[in-house]
Curated annotation (Swiss-Prot):
Functional summary from the UniProt entry: Part of a stress-induced multi-chaperone system, it is involved in the recovery of the cell from heat-induced damage, in cooperation with DnaK, DnaJ and GrpE. Acts before DnaK, in the processing of protein aggregates. Protein binding stimulates the ATPase activity; ATP hydrolysis unfolds the denatured protein aggregates, which probably helps expose new hydrophobic binding sites on the surface of ClpB-bound aggregates, contributing to the solubilization and refolding of denatured protein aggregates by DnaK.
Subunit composition and interactions: Homohexamer. The oligomerization is ATP-dependent.
Subcellular location: Cytoplasm
Region (Repeat 2): 85-146
Species this protein is from: Helicobacter hepaticus (strain ATCC 51449 / 3B1)
Sequence segments annotated as region (Repeat 1): 7-72
Annotated protein name in UniProt: Chaperone protein ClpB
Length: 859
């Protein structure tokens, strides 16, 4: 058989790389120097793995290999097809074949090639100055272990666990894992299952972000600290990287071979617990025609108790994938990992705070941690604690770090101003006039002042930055010393631990305290930078994520909420009873007296057209969320047919539009803090009210995909013209309410009416109300005109005239808008388009002889 066919895939790839290097270097023959250069250039090669294990820098070795290549004879006419293998390389391959046979391998692997040629002159020339050859051989053999190369992909699977796994116990030993707080019950349950005789494989089930992986890291920390039962002491906890295991498996059977090698390695070691995160991925992984999936490879070892495995997945994926394989399911014992409470999440945040501070080089206040736990729980409803709270802290700290490392805003503004003045000065110097020369002198003075200010700010910025840099260096040093002390204690070197704890650490802490004191003194005089993450920083991040204005979360809302009635009355005229009813519900919510699981408020607005039902909803959105876009308006005339009702929650599976989601559910998922306006609700199909029952009662609605959408931070408003004739006809308030209730019973079921917080009746508008609305509408027009630089005024007589023209007791305020268009806006538009008025002019609208006329005051 051809020797080339006996090479492993890695050895073949090395030869190909060596051929490319020979071609690039204009060498006619592929030599051993090319082979060693190719191996050193490949980060994944067994040679580099061995060098990394020996802590040897490969840069110098690579340079040495290049210099050996440079010594080889060169040719100007080298073609790829003309390349040949040198005698030395051919001899080296034969030696490697002999070493492979002696070792029981069926194919020649890279490690056997290296071991066979340790005494070869080129190897000695490159490696001997920097590498202990005997130690190097030992390292290569330790990487191989007991494995035999039985296929061409065999050396891809050497030291499988180190390639495809992460040693969590080693990370715990190095103190690089975050502390695990408040998960004692789950860790104890996991240890209890692990020491059972059978079915001793725990599987952690919980929502994304509740801390399943952290529970496993907690076990690794306990193993290192010897705080586990005797049978679990000296165990190694290895996290299997499924993506690395699958990635690059080009040939059929290669994935199975890799996994089988991992299982065999775990069996041989005898003291390894395997952790598979997202364990549902093993069901079906690698399966194709004529091959097994990962689950079937693991089952026999799990059944015999040869493989200790901890799994972790979400409840949804466990049900969807894992439970389908009953044989696999029965080999695992479930442990539920529940979402921690706000107080538990706060304890977790306090535990990981030092690591976050060290990473970002900022201080994190305790108030920020409290804000992160509370605000994330209240405002980020589609994710889970503690993950969402940690994300808030992390992002706020990253934002602050970016500000520290970037140029301060004040300095940027001054630099920009200087640049603008320099450009202006250049332009003025090109046209010499007395005015220009005077302006140039002014610019020179201003530039002088600005440059002084710039230098002062730059000095201040550098001084502040240097303090931060020194604090960061000291924190890193302190962290390193604490780790060193911990390792010394574990290895029993108490003299070294005492020297660090009572000698070095106090010195470093004193330096840190001095720097903090220096920073506090600098803060008293005012600083450009800040180094503390505060509750305001956290609220800013929540504001960006959820769209809730920052001041709503942090300022005391008492005064604002107490003034809700006067605020609504500015835009909604003549509806005092309606405003009071809405204000009462919102005050109950803000005082924390209502049911937190239900919407903030749910109202049915009744009244004739044009009395302000929709306007009230818009004003409420503006008041509560500082944004009129927080109003989700659903026109119920679009849901008159039974088949259209499903659009609210999404089409059922198999129907067109299933992937798009529901009109209502998707809108609230994207903007959980909204006012939902169901306009003209009496036109909707009765099935719509069955959907609304769930929203009004539980504050939740499940869409067609089974996802629960939270409505607890919404205000539900339904408008209707039902009984508007009775509202217009009956003057007595009590009689009107009675008549309206009777009319409602004819349209809506009692269970729907019972779930509403209030039925609000809007009164018909009188002439006095219409006059007030003229003022509101005209203010809006005057504001738009002022943006164009035009002042507009309207006399009191003109206002009353427009109110009279636009008053209609049947149609409410809508005809008034048309009257204002005709009498004021149309005339103003003509004046602007005819260029009769310009920026800075004033236009007065007044009543003269029963008609509105205009008077223009030029600037």
């Amino acid at each position: 058989m051809n020797l080339f066919e006996k090479l492993t895939n890695q050895m073949k790839e090395t030869l190909d790389s060596a051929a490319s290097l020979a071609l690039h270097s204009s060498n006619q023959e592929i030599s051993l120097a090319h082979i060693y250069w190719a191996l050193l250039s490949n980060h994944q090669s067994v040679l580099n793995q061995a060098l990394n294990k020996m802590n040897i820098d490969k840069t110098a070795l690579e340079l040495q290999a290049r210099s050996e290549v440079d010594k080889l004879p060169k040719s100007s006419q080298v073609q790829k097809e003309n390349l040949s293998i040198s005698k030395e390389l051919s001899s080296a391959l034969n030696l490697a074949q002999g070493e492979a046979i002696k070792n029981g391998d069926s194919f020649i692997a890279v490690d056997m090639f290296l071991i066979a040629n340790l005494k070869e002159s080129t190897f000695v020339a490159i490696f001997k100055p920097l590498v202990d050859i005997a130690e190097f051989k030992k390292t290569l053999l330790s990487l191989r272990g007991e494995s035999k190369i039985e296929s061409q992909s065999g050396d891809d699977n050497l030291e499988s666990l180190s390639k495809f796994g992460i040693d969590l116990t080693q990370k715990a030993l190095e103190n690089t894992l975050d502390p695990v707080i408040g998960r004692d019950d789950e860790i104890n349950a996991m240890m209890q299952i692990l020491i059972r005789k059978s079915k001793n494989n725990p599987i952690l089930l919980g929502e994304p972000g509740v801390g399943k992986t952290a529970v496993v890291e907690g076990l690794a920390q306990r193993i290192v600290a010897k705080a586990v039962p005797t049978s679990l002491q000296n165990k190694k906890l290895i996290a299997l990287d499924m993506s690395a295991l699958i990635a690059g498996a080009k040939y059929r059977g290669e994935f199975e071979e890799r996994l089988k090698n991992v299982v065999d390695e775990v069996k041989k070691a005898g003291n390894i617990i395997l952790f598979i995160d997202e364990i549902h991925t093993i069901v079906g992984a690698g399966a194709s025609e004529g091959s097994m999936d990962a689950a079937n490879i693991l089952k026999p070892a799990l059944a015999r108790g040869e493989l200790h495995t901890i799994g972790a997945t979400t409840l949804k994926e466990y049900r969807k994938y894992f439970e389908k394989d009953a044989a696999l399911t029965r080999r695992f014992q479930p442990i539920n990992v529940n979402e921690p409470s706000i107080n538990e999440a706060l304890q977790i945040l306090r535990g990981i705070k030092p690591n976050l501070e060290a990473h970002h080089n900022v201080n994190i206040t305790d108030a920020a941690l409290v804000a992160a736990a509370k605000l994330s729980s209240r405002y980020i409803t589609d994710r889970f604690l503690p993950d969402k709270a940690i994300d808030l802290i992390d992002e706020a700290a990253a934002e602050l770090k970016m500000q520290i490392e970037s140029e301060p805003l004040e300095l940027s503004k001054i630099k920009k101003h200087i640049a603008n003045l320099e450009v202006e000065k250049q332009a003025l110097n090109m046209e010499k006039t007395n005015v220009n020369e005077a302006r140039v002198l002014e610019i020179d003075k201003e530039l002088e002042n600005l440059r002084e200010e710039k230098m002062s700010l730059e000095g201040k910025f550098e001084q502040e930055k240097s303090v931060f840099t020194r604090i960061a260096t000291i924190k890193a040093e302190l962290d390193s010393l604490k780790r060193e002390s911990e390792l010394a204690k574990r290895s029993g070197d108490y003299n070294k631990a005492a020297e660090i704890d009572y000698g070095k650490i106090p010195d470093i802490q004193a330096q840190e305290a001095a720097l903090h004191k220096q920073w506090e003194e600098m803060q008293q005089n005012g600083t450009l930078l800040k180094n503390a993450v505060t509750q305001e920083s956290i609220a800013g991040v929540v504001s960006r994520w959820s769209g809730i204005p920052i001041k709503k979360m942090l300022q005391s809302q008492k005064e604002r909420i107490l003034g809700i009635e006067s605020e609504l009355a500015k835009s909604v005229v003549g509806q005092d009873d309606a405003i009071k009813a809405i204000a009462r519900a919102i005050k109950r919510n803000k005082a924390g007296l209502n049911d937190a699981s239900r919407p903030i408020g749910s109202f049915l607005f009744l009244g004739p057209t044009g009395v302000g039902k929709t306007q009230c909803a818009k004003t409420l959105a503006e008041f509560l969320f500082d944004n009129a876009k927080s109003l989700v308006r659903i026109d119920m005339s679009e849901y008159m047919e039974k088949h259209a009702v499903s659009r609210l929650v999404g089409a059922p599976p198999g129907y067109v539009g299933y992937e798009e989601g529901g009109v209502l559910t998707e809108a609230i998922r994207r903007k959980p803090y909204s006012i939902v306006l169901f306009d003209e609700v009496e036109k909707a199909h009765p099935d719509v009210f069955n959907i609304l029952l769930q929203v009004l009662d539980d504050g939740r609605l499940t869409d067609s995909k089974g996802v629960s959408v939270d409505f607890s931070n919404t205000i539900i408003i339904l408008t209707s013209n039902i009984a508007s004739d009775k509202i217009m006809e009956i003057g007595d308030k009590q009689e009107r309410q009675k008549a309206v209730k009777e009319a409602l019973k004819m349209y809506f079921k009692p269970e729907f009416l019972n779930r509403l917080d209030d039925v609000v009746v809007f009164n018909p508008l009188g002439l006095a109300d219409i006059t007030q609305i003229v003022d509101i509408m005209f203010k809006s027009l005057a504001k738009r005109a002022l943006e164009k630089g035009i002042n507009v005024t309207l006399s009191q007589e003109a206002r009353e005239h427009i109110a009279q023209v636009g008053f209609d007791s049947v149609y409410g305020a809508r005809p008034l808008k048309r009257a204002l268009y005709e009498e004021v806006e149309d005339r103003l538009a003509d004046l602007i388009l005819r260029d009769e008025i310009k920026e800075g002019d004033r236009v007065n609208f007044a009543l003269k002889n029963g008609e509105i006329c205009t008077h223009i005051e030029k600037e």
